[in-house]
Design a protein with these regions (language model features):
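Short coil/turn linking the two alpha-helices of tandem helical-hairpin repeats
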Residues: 20, 51-61, 90-94
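Short helix-capping/linker turns of helical repeat alpha-solenoids
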Residues: 8-12, 22-28, 40-47, 56-58, ...
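Solenoid-like repeat scaffolds
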Residues: 37-40, 110
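Extracytoplasmic and endomembrane cell-envelope/extracellular-matrix remodeling and assembly machinery
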Residues: 2-3, 93-202
Length: 202
C-alpha cells in the first residue's frame, strides 16, 4: 500500500496534512477548507488550527467567539496544548463574545465533537480496511503527518497494516498517545504559559 492510499484511508490525517501544506504556502482559504474536512473526522489538531485562524483572522475576518468555539471542540479530549489555547481564549473574551460563543458552541460540538465525528471516522476506517485486504504492504514507503508542537509524526511502511491503524478503538488510542501530553524528549518547546484557574465555563 502506498502512502497516498494509506492517507486516503485516514481522512483525518490526510486533510490535516493538506491543510498544513496549504497554510505554509500562504493559501489560507484552501487550508481552512482542508482543516474543515479533517475536523469532520474528529481531527483535534485541525480543529485547533481553525480556532487560531478564526481568532487571528487568517484567511477570514477575525472572529474571536468562533475561535473559542473551535478551541473548545479541539480541547474535548483534554490534550494539554489545546486546553491551554481554549483557556487563554476564554479569558480574553468580553461578556458579549462569551454569550455568542455559548450560543453557537453547542451546534459545533454536536457536529464536530467525538460523539459524531469519531463515529464518522470509524465507519470510514472499517470500509477502508475491507478494501485494503489483499493488498501488498510497501515496507519502503513512510508517511509523515503534522504532529504535536509543529513536529512531524512518522508512520513507517511496515506498520501500514498494523491493527492500531485500522481498528477504530485502537486507532483512537494511538492518536491519544501521540497528542495527549507528548513525552518531553519528543519535542523542543518553551514553557507553557500559565492560565488562571477557576473561570466559569459554559
Amino acid at each position: 500500500m502506498a502512502s497516498e492510499s494509506f492517507l486516503n484511508a485516514h481522512p483525518d490525517m490526510k486533510f490535516r496534512t493538506e491543510g498544513f501544506l496549504a497554510y505554509q504556502d500562504g493559501r489560507f482559504a484552501e487550508a481552512r477548507k482542508y482543516f474543515l474536512q479533517a475536523a469532520e473526522f474528529s481531527d483535534k489538531p485541525a480543529q485547533a488550527m481553525l480556532a487560531e485562524m478564526a481568532w487571528k483572522g487568517v484567511g477570514q475576518p477575525p472572529d474571536r467567539p468562533m475561535g473559542y468555539v473551535w478551541a473548545d471542540v479541539a480541547a474535548e479530549r483534554g490534550y494539554r496544548q489545546f486546553v491551554v489555547l481554549r483557556e487563554r481564549y476564554w479569558s480574553e473574551l468580553d461578556a458579549a463574545e462569551r454569550d455568542r460563543a455559548i450560543e453557537e458552541g453547542s451546534a459545533y460540538m454536536q457536529r464536530y465533537g467525538d460523539a459524531s465525528a469519531q463515529y464518522r471516522l470509524a465507519k470510514h476506517l472499517q470500509r477502508a480496511r475491507r478494501l485494503m485486504i489483499g493488498g501488498r504492504p510497501r515496507k519502503d514507503v513512510d508517511v509523515w503527518v503534522p504532529g504535536p508542537y509543529g513536529l512531524r509524526t512518522q508512520i513507517r511502511g511496515h506498520d501500514f497494516y498494523a491493527t492500531k491503524f485500522w481498528e477504530p478503538k485502537q486507532y483512537f488510542a494511538w492518536v491519544d498517545a501521540v497528542w495527549k501530553d507528548p513525552p518531553v524528549e519528543r519535542v523542543e518547546v518553551g514553557p507553557l504559559e500559565g492560565v488562571e484557574a477557576g473561570r466559569e465555563r459554559p
